[in-house]
């Protein structure tokens, strides 16, 4: 179990909030103070709340749940996509399409279109179309992949959403709340913490800070997946042992019945 440490947070600038004039008063409990007009986050609380969020995600994945990583701001895109992929989870790193979760069946049609086009390019059947159409379809694939590539294997609602900057991702969070999907989020000093179920107070703008949080949340997913694999293996062994015991008992009873 690899929790993020206070040293790592300090090194990546997690403690730096926004300018004091841009703060949300609801974040007061998570702010240590101010320096040069910048709010400083209380990292003791961040460490504690991060561990709580980490365990929540690991537990959900251990039960078979999937996590949707959301971070569409430029600074977050690369880290969110890379870490979600490393963990075998889903991600949205470009503009959130309204209805991605609440109107998933409509979004699914676009995903199916993307998969069909990719298959045609892969097996060569695309060659039966005129060159002009092939170029247009190639552009369509690129556009659809940009918007939906990170969720094209998503078959239903995720168990948890991990969000960078809930202020920017308000529409995504509203959809999660409507569907009862718990939200874990990195919440900066200018955000409303009431929108989030599991708050991680910290810098949601610095690339290194975002990468730190995303990588550790990916680790939480991998930890949960490993636990699930172990539980399944243990369950299979117990089932096998029980079947063997029943078989042995049946063999022992057979001679007595014969008498």
Curated annotation (Swiss-Prot):
Molecular function terms, GO-annotated: structural constituent of ribosome
PROSITE patterns: RIBOSOMAL_S2_1
Gene Ontology terms: cellular component: cytosolic small ribosomal subunit
Keywords, comma-separated and alphabetical: Ribonucleoprotein, Ribosomal protein
One GO process term, biological-process aspect: translation
Location of region: Disordered: 232-259
Domain of life (superkingdom): Bacteria
TM ranges: none
Family designation: Belongs to the universal ribosomal protein uS2 family.
NCBIfam families tied to this protein: rpsB_bact
UniProt-recorded name of the protein: Small ribosomal subunit protein uS2
